UniProtKB/Swiss-Prot annotation:
Phylogenetic placement of the source organism: Viruses, Monodnaviria, Shotokuvirae, Cossaviricota, Papovaviricetes
Designated gene of the protein: E7
Motif annotated as LXCXE motif, chain positions: 23-27
Start-end of unnamed zinc fingers: 57-94
InterPro entries to which the protein is assigned, alphabetical: Papilloma_E7
Name the record gives this protein: Protein E7
Species the sequence originates in: Human papillomavirus type 49
BP-aspect Gene Ontology terms: DNA-templated transcription; symbiont-mediated perturbation of host cell cycle G1/S transition checkpoint; symbiont-mediated suppression of host innate immune response; symbiont-mediated suppression of host type I interferon-mediated signaling pathway
Recorded domain comment: The E7 terminal domain is an intrinsically disordered domain, whose flexibility and conformational transitions confer target adaptability to the oncoprotein. It allows adaptation to a variety of protein targets and exposes the PEST degradation sequence that regulates its turnover in the cell.
Entry keywords, A to Z: Activator, DNA-binding, Early protein, G1/S host cell cycle checkpoint dysregulation by virus, Host cytoplasm, Host nucleus, Host-virus interaction, Inhibition of host innate immune response by virus, Inhibition of host interferon signaling pathway by virus, Interferon antiviral system evasion, Metal-binding, Modulation of host cell cycle by virus, Oncogene, Transcription, Transcription regulation, Viral immunoevasion, Zinc, Zinc-finger
Amino acid sequence: MIGKEVTIPDIILQEEFGQPIDLQCYENLTAEAPAEQELEAEEELIQGIPYKVIATCGGGCGARLRVFVLATDAAIRSFQELLLEELQFLCPQCREEIRNGGR
């Protein structure tokens, strides 16, 4: 641009159109697939996951006790809270002692 006023020859438009962007993902989703996945996830939650729990005897002898359970994630967390707070396992010897009044 030369001067104070703009003239038409001073304006040069250079428009270049690139390739159009294809926004389609072309995924083939069926209505059954998500429902099927949800059912499988629900079955896993209902069936649970096998856990091995190792705890010490609450009767005082300190014996290690193993318990095998099948539980969901929420159930095993609740079980863990019970073991840490108010639930204690007993070995057979301590159970007999407590049952017989310590005799």
